[in-house]
Amino acid sequence: VIKFIGNIYERLRKSPKRIVFPEGTEPRVQRAAARYVKLGLGTPVLLGDREEIESVAKREGVNLDHVGVIDPAHAEDLDLFCERLETLKRYRDLGPLGAKKLMIKPNYFGAMMVQYGHADGIVTGAGEEAANTLRPLLQLISPQPHLKSVSSCTALDLSNKRYGERGVMFFADCAVIPDPTVDQLADIAVETGVLYRTLTGMKPRIAMLSFTTHSNGSLAGPAKVAAATALARQRASQRGIEMEIDGEMQADTALLPELGAKKAPQSLVAGR
């Protein structure tokens, strides 16, 4: 755990980031922001009512020195963000009052901060339902030009270093697209691989999971995964991204060397 997270810490210390936390009154979020400062990783910004944030911090014994606090309802950028919101087709009919009512919600305000460079990133979802946190992010933050779909991934750093790359594995997509198409699945694979390399510096080995291993397209579900595997390889090659992609395969085949060698002996991914 120390090495994977420690490497990210070192990169942040060399290039500190301004991170916005919309759930500014949550004690757990406040402690995370305070630790972000203590570790020298950048500048955290809590969103919410200033008095309530300070009251919670005092009650919980959280030191908010060098932690920014912005109340969206009284922020200098509120009018600017409302104007920008009304330029978006989805929100064009809101009117000034409707735009303001939406923009004072911390997740919307935080998403707009990221979209227009007022923050480098956003950390949210500690206490709210996923839909309430994802909606403003997906609607207000523009994806990179080459992306057709936006997805999520979960990073695991296991104490058992037998699995993954010394215990480090990424799983996608676990939150945003419940039933991806072939096209979306290929995007998810490649972009997760890119993120993996960015955060670890290691070559990605991507297993496209299903309930069969190399079944030759006899079933619809595995056939979709196999087609996505081929498309993901093509897209990675076109962009000059070096990564190993194989599928479809079962999870145990991907993770366990003895099963990988038995079920997919030619694979550079199975069992690894």
Q: What is each model feature region?
A:
Residues 1-227, 231-271:
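Anion-binding alpha/beta catalytic cores of soluble intermediary-metabolism enzymes, centered on
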